[in-house]
Amino acid sequence: MCGIVGYIGDKQATPILLEGLTRLEYRGYDSAGIAILHNGNINIKKAKGRLNVLRELVEKDYMEGTIGIGHTRWATHGEPSDTNSHPHLSQSGLIAVVHNGIIENYLPLKKWLIEEGYNFISETDTEVVANLLEYYYNGDIVEALRKVLDRIEGSYALGVLCKDNPDMIVAARKEAPLIVGIGNGENFIASDIPAILKYTRNVYFLDDHEIAIIKKDSVEFIDVFGRKIGKSLFEVKWDVEAAEKGGYEHFMIKEIHEQPAAIKDTLRGRIINDSQIVLDNINITKEDLEKIEKIFIVACGTAYHAGVVGKYVIESFARIPVEVDVASEFRYRNPIVNERILTIVISQSGETADTIAALKEAKRKGSRVIAITNVVGSSVSREADEVLYTWAGPEIAVASTKAYTTQLIALYLIALDFALKKGTMSSTKVVEIISELKKLPDKVQYLLDNKEVIQKFASEHYNVKDVFYIGRGLDYAVAMEGSLKLKEISYIHSEAYPAGELKHGTLALVEEGTLIIALATQDDLFEKMLSNIKEVKARGGYVVAFAKQGNLQLEGVVDKVIYIPDTLKELTPVLTVVPLQLLAYYMAVEKGCDVDKPRNLAKSVTVE
């Protein structure tokens, strides 16, 4: 969840580092800092709070130098404070370190270093790394880093400066993202591509247990044993402008409006003759599918909600049992996984720590793993056996929108491919579903073009204290996502419930004026859903229902009906979620919330 940037070249490092950290704000942070190596000294400025606080410090006392490292911190060890902010210096000031991850054995290492005469000024695990590097340093910072990596346990992306080596940055990673950017007479390190995209499109992705030695005109990669490694250079295709707001007030609303294009891009090239599916490099045969006894879908947050939809459609289309698991729970319950289990992991960033851990656990137990991710070269994409990319483009807002809808598209494609190969769906039905899939971008655009009704409703109801989302079947899956969107960016208490469960306890919370969002798009469940709606209306609930165009049965029953374009029931989540995203957004705007960077949250959760 922290952000790392490093620069070495002929330009002043400070503005490049500050700009790079700005590009990483979406990852979430509570403090920031930079370290500049100049004239044999390492100068550090760091502060709790937003990057503007750090900028003010730098403006008062500018930091000269052409080599430096920067960091945005999300507290894990030690509260947010100036002292706990990164970069951290070793005791003598010889070495500066920035770190993303968690050093699990930092306490015994800290105790040992104290016994060796080292003092600590922060509560962080990162200062342990800095002092450990100094302890092992004997004129060779790379050798010292190798020895440190042999001692520390846990996850890390590290950027290191040593004032005895003013011509290099050294970096290493294990289970935390880190890239190396290649420029012309200048090179970079970063947690994510947007931080350096203004300066270079050519990057290397560090893998676990690798060390990078970065000079201004060369980069060398070695493993923890000191052996040289050859790596492939990756060219970033998307533009830096894709990570800008493009005239919208917030990234979130921009990304909501990008969904028609993102859906088209994710479908592009994967449908042949309107009747066949091509899943990139995924080659699961009919024989493979016959051996699969069960599918696990494993993910976190919004991606988990997409996985719940995936369960419905894979079971419906391909008739394979599916279990959806929260990644942070998956590996700790010793799941029954073997070579007859297929695991599908979903992660927008491809760097979600819990999802990566679950992926590795599934592979260790013999499962074949397919990853659905939005980031080429991410950890998830490299660890999985096969990958299906969602071509959503960079998603900057913490609250995920276009990544969710493209994850749904990816799951529909997988379900259709499996159904075709297993013969569980007629070719006529497949053609019908594919035809409707191709219509979704225009139908999403229709919802966006008619967003004023949502905006007006939000302006009238943003002061509510509680909102309950209810639905059945696929509508319940979407209700969970709608509820999450509302609570995470507007800070309004919200919960989602299966409508049939209301009478088992939740109905006690409904009183006069309680806002109920009722999703009623599933034709085969509509009558039961109508009964549930009447239950909450009878208790005084203010009900806003979402239904398909042409269904007039809710008129006069609920307080307000919002219509979505008609489509096949399996595809309704892609449409129903859009007005729910808009509702959350406009509620948050009305309340004056920080929409793109909600409190206490981060875009990419890279610690467990």
Curated annotation (Swiss-Prot):
Task: Report the protein's function.
Answer: Catalyzes the first step in hexosamine metabolism, converting fructose-6P into glucosamine-6P using glutamine as a nitrogen source.
The UniProt entry, under InterPro entries, shows:
GATase_2_dom, GFAT, GFAT_N, GlmS/AgaS_SIS, GlmS/FrlB_SIS, Ntn_hydrolases_N, SIS_dom, SIS_dom_sf
**Compartments, as annotated in UniProt:** Cytoplasm
User: What's this protein's name?
Assistant: Glutamine--fructose-6-phosphate aminotransferase [isomerizing]
Keyword Disulfide bond assigned: no
Species of origin? Caldanaerobacter subterraneus subsp. tengcongensis (strain DSM 15242 / JCM 11007 / NBRC 100824 / MB4) (Thermoanaerobacter tengcongensis)
> Which parts of the sequence belong to the SIS domain?
285-424, 453-598
Which HAMAP family does the protein's record reference? GlmS
Q: Which residues form the active site?
A: C2 (nucleophile), K603 (for fru-6p isomerization activity)
Subunit-structure text? Homodimer.
**Coiled coil (UniProt feature):** none
Entry EC number(s): 2.6.1.16
Task: Report keywords, A-Z.
Answer: Aminotransferase, Cytoplasm, Glutamine amidotransferase, Repeat, Transferase
Where does the protein principally reside?
cytoplasm
Q: Which SUPFAM superfamilies does the annotation name?
A: N-terminal nucleophile aminohydrolases (Ntn hydrolases), SIS domain
Q: Which reaction does it catalyse?
A: D-fructose 6-phosphate + L-glutamine = D-glucosamine 6-phosphate + L-glutamate
